[in-house]
Amino acid sequence: MRILFASSEVHPLIKTGGLADVSASLPQALKRLRQDVRVVMPAYGSVLDKAGDLEQVTTLQLPGFPGDTVTLLSGTLPGSRVPLWLVDAPRLFRRAGDPYRAPDGHDWQDNYLRFGLFARLIEHLALDRAGLDWRPDVVHCNDWQAGLAPLMLSMHESRPATVFTIHNLAYQGLFPRHAFDALNLPPQLWHYQGLEFHGKLSFIKGGIGFADHITTVSPSYAREILTPQQGFGLDGLLNHRAGVLTGILNGVDYREWDPGKDRHLVARYSADDLSGKARCKAALQHHFKLPCHSGIPLLGHVGRMVAQKGVDLLLKAAEPLLAAGEAQLVVVGSGDATLEQTARSLAERYPEHMGLHIGYSEPLAHQLEAGADIFVMPSRFEPCGLNQMYSLRYGTVPVVRNTGGLADTVVDADPAHLAARDATGIQFDEATPQALADALARALALYHDPACWKRLMQAGMAQDFSWGRSAEAYLDLYKDLVS
């Protein structure tokens, strides 16, 4: 089957979140299932620096973008055999900053043009209008940045099937009315049943409203987004399309995330020999200038510092533990300036008990997963989440809120599951500092029971969330759409 996989970010070329991991791992898993899958993404300047050998395959003038000559570059996704197409429109994509924001942290004002052009290019590839003599059976678009492509393709009678995956409904690609006009979209689409959303243009509605099938990244999240609490104003549309909505759990690339092979670690280890994990803990403590005390529980967190991730809950719940010297905490992430400052203040108050890295570092993320005893993920909502699955494989017991993919992947250490020896972590329900503090107290009590803690670690390490299972589910969906 021929599959065009469209994403605005793909690891290891560029990454701001889990979308990049999925956009690398799922195509590779489909390739291993002998599918003809090709990835298309924008040619940001930093991507061109990392992409290796590239060949110019065609030059296009896309309708609606008279000022931009688009060059399509062909290569291979690094570390794989997956063909890669890069959309090179220098005025729009070769910029400093990340894919969506300027160096000052503000969104690029012309993101609607940038990702409108990206969608138009996806349409041309899908209809084999780029002169490449290749037409996909399925076009798989991801998040709002590719959201207009299913809409554009829906206007053609003879076209590939379309799949749209929601990785995080909170990010919708909303723009002023003038953006709709600038993209020369059909006037009849300026309607609540089209692309209009409370007076703004919504890119994500292009995918949700017009794709042949919608997926999201865990079964629980697929149910949650049908509710007013988690639907972000789109629950009505999603309920209308619930018959073509499926939750497919993301997978983990265990070639990248395996403590037995991880090149970023000072020592490697397995469920049968955990001695290397103690060395990783000592190395993490040393890196953050914390006392290298093997007996103190070390809590870890990696993620964007935004309200969704519940970092504020973590900082409030952890402070009494830090003040009492009952735990250490290491946090890696960046985002909201207020949350960053709160984290800095806490680290300054407890320099012997808290380490902080503002920013993101892939090696450090691996080292934290290996060195921490407990990974804390108190998300207010979490479409899937990857770090809790990484933590399980690394024997780092996750403490998670009972939501979305966290609920689907972590088995709570309640008395019944402890007795059955299938518990893998701690869940809590309410998004409050007290509920998290209670969950951490449960975790610490188990930590101080070494035999029980080792069973928890080993049960987590035995879990299998590999991409093969997820890729087969997507392939079954693709086949249903084209049959």
Curated annotation (Swiss-Prot):
SUPFAM superfamilies, per database record: UDP-Glycosyltransferase/glycogen phosphorylase
Gene: glgA
Protein name: Glycogen synthase
Broad EC category: transferase
Pfam families (alphabetical): Glyco_transf_5 (PF08323), Glycos_transf_1 (PF00534)
GO BP term (any one): glycogen biosynthetic process
EC numbers, comma separated: 2.4.1.21
Binding-site residues for ADP-alpha-D-glucose, renumbered to this chain: 15
Keyword field: Glycogen biosynthesis, Glycosyltransferase, Transferase
UniProt-listed HAMAP family: Glycogen_synth (MF_00484)
Lineage, uppermost ranks: Bacteria, Pseudomonadati, Pseudomonadota, Gammaproteobacteria, Chromatiales
Function: Synthesizes alpha-1,4-glucan chains using ADP-glucose.
Family membership noted in the UniProt record: Belongs to the glycosyltransferase 1 family. Bacterial/plant glycogen synthase subfamily.
